[in-house]
């Protein structure tokens, strides 16, 4: 069922993004007087189609990995262009119209992101305060003088009020060499203490990096004691006699102070039996359990009892319509720049290409965010929409950015780029995009 849910959420997520993108092309083309012959979501065999009032065929196709808008064009051997309808063909349009039509797809993705973020910001944001809960021994954070209890209020001069805000600010520094400036102190005051943390090609080789943990910081989360919150039917823990509410004191003589201690202990011991000492309603009970082996990782089918988060550790931000709109535009701009910078760092070899993700990863994230709530899924949708818009603006033939380059050259030269050059460029671009997609899928499979 989980696989089916992931597939459905991937189809819904990609379907929304592709439809919005292609609708941008379609809407501007119709405003420019260009006849649209076909508006397709997906590729390959047509599953369902209908005729629009303007004569456009709308189609849903079998391979849901994209879409396209086919316009009347003299260069298309299948399209019958006469003197009567030549003005409705794409290639007969002035350069400004061509540029507007091509750029409308990515613009629609950015607009979708702004609208989604506007709704989320208007609804209000809630996040964990970026309080330092732990500093790893001998970590760069400890060596720099950071201590437990401080709150990160700025990263490189950018104000940060939540854990996610700190994470995003740190992610901007992936692959960099220099120093990260952290300002810590009281979030209610503008006065803070600054720490300079040296970095060299920071996390350049890391896959799915956790920037705070890389510095040796645990932010926002209160220490979680090893208390049983749930048990899986048929799991090793249930079979061993564990009960909800049991607090794990030790395992095989090793003290268990936090839930992470217990998880690491169990994961390292598949098919190995050991005794566990628990506190059950004030009495100590000894149980014997053997973790099941799941891909060489031990598991006992046990969930943690999460503590209540005190209100002092929660940051809430509400905005009015104008402020929410401004914040949505600014966040979209920041994420767009971050996307371009990350791609450029990848080209330079400053960050690992293992961070490229394909449709499998999108399906997994779409499913997990949907399970976390509608607002979380919408946040992912906005982020993915920005990524789609940015990628399509890359100056690669076949992508919208490549078409934009050709039309800019046409405007400068006063004539279109020779068709043979365009065809050869599109073939090279198609090969590059296909190779990139295969590499991303390879990364997805390697993570499974």
Q: Model-found features: residue ranges?
A:
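Alpha-helical transmembrane segments of multi-pass membrane proteins
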Residues: 14-18, 70, 109, 113, ...
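Aromatic-capped interface at the extracytoplasmic side
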Residues: 31-33, 116-134, 442-448
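PDZ/PDZ-like peptide-tail recognition elements
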Residues: 99-130, 168-170, 181-229, 275, ...
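Terminal peptide-recognition signature
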Residues: 21-24, 60, 105, 141, ...
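PDZ/PDZ-like domain micro-motif
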Residues: 136-150, 168-169, 233-246, 265
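Residue-level signature of transmembrane alpha-helical entry/exit and packing/kink sites
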Residues: 2, 6-10, 93-102, 109, ...
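Functional transmembrane alpha-helices
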Residues: 85-96, 210-255, 260-390, 405-428, ...
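Membrane-embedded helix-turn/re-entrant segments that form the catalytic/gating core
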Residues: 30-113, 185, 193-199, 204-210, ...
């Amino acid at each position: 069922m989980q696989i089916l849910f992931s597939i459905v959420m991937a189809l819904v997520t990609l379907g929304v993004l592709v439809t919005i993108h292609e609708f941008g092309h379609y809407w501007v083309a119709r405003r420019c007087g260009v006849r649209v012959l076909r508006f397709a979501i997906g590729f390959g065999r047509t599953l369902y189609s209908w005729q629009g009032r303007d004569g456009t065929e709308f189609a849903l196709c079998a391979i849901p990995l994209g879409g396209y808008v086919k316009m009347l064009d003299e260069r298309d051997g299948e399209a019958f262009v006469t003197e009567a309808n030549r003005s409705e063909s794409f290639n007969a349009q002035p350069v400004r119209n061509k540029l507007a039509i091509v750029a409308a797809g990515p613009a629609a993705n950015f607009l979708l992101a702004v609208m989604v973020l506007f709704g989320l910001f208007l609804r209000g944001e809630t996040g964990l305060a970026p309080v330092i809960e732990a500093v790893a021994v001998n970590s760069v954070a400890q060596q720099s003088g950071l201590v437990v209890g401080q709150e990160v209020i700025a990263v490189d001069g950018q104000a940060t009020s939540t854990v996610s805000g700190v994470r995003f600010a740190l992610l901007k520094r992936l692959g960099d060499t220099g120093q990260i400036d952290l300002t810590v102190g009281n979030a209610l005051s503008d006065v803070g203490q600054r720490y300079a943390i040296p970095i060299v090609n920071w996390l350049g080789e890391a896959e799915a990096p956790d920037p705070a943990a890389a510095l040796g910081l645990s932010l926002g989360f209160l220490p979680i004691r090893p208390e049983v919150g749930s048990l899986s039917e048929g799991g090793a823990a249930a079979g061993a006699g564990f009960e909800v509410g049991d607090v794990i004191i030790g395992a095989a003589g090793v003290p268990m102070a936090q839930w992470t201690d217990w998880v690491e202990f169990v994961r390292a011991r598949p098919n190995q039996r050991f005794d566990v000492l628990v506190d059950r309603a004030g009495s100590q009970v000894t149980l014997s359990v053997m973790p099941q082996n799941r891909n060489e990782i031990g598991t006992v089918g046990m969930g943690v009892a999460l503590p209540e988060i005190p209100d002092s550790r929660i940051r809430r931000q509400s905005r009015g319509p104008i402020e929410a709109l401004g914040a949505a535009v600014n966040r979209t701009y920041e994420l767009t720049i971050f996307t371009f910078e990350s791609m450029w760092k990848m080209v330079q070899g400053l960050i690992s290409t293992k961070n490229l993700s394909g449709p499998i990863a999108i399906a997994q994230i779409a499913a997990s965010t949907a399970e976390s709530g509608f607002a979380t899924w919408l946040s992912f949708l906005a982020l993915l929409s920005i990524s789609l818009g940015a990628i399509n603006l890359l100056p690669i033939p076949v992508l919208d950015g490549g078409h934009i380059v050709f039309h800019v050259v046409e405007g400068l030269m006063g004539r279109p780029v020779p068709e043979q050059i365009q065809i050869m460029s599109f073939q090279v671009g198609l090969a590059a995009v296909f190779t990139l997609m295969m590499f991303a899928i390879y990364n997805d499979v390697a993570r499974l």
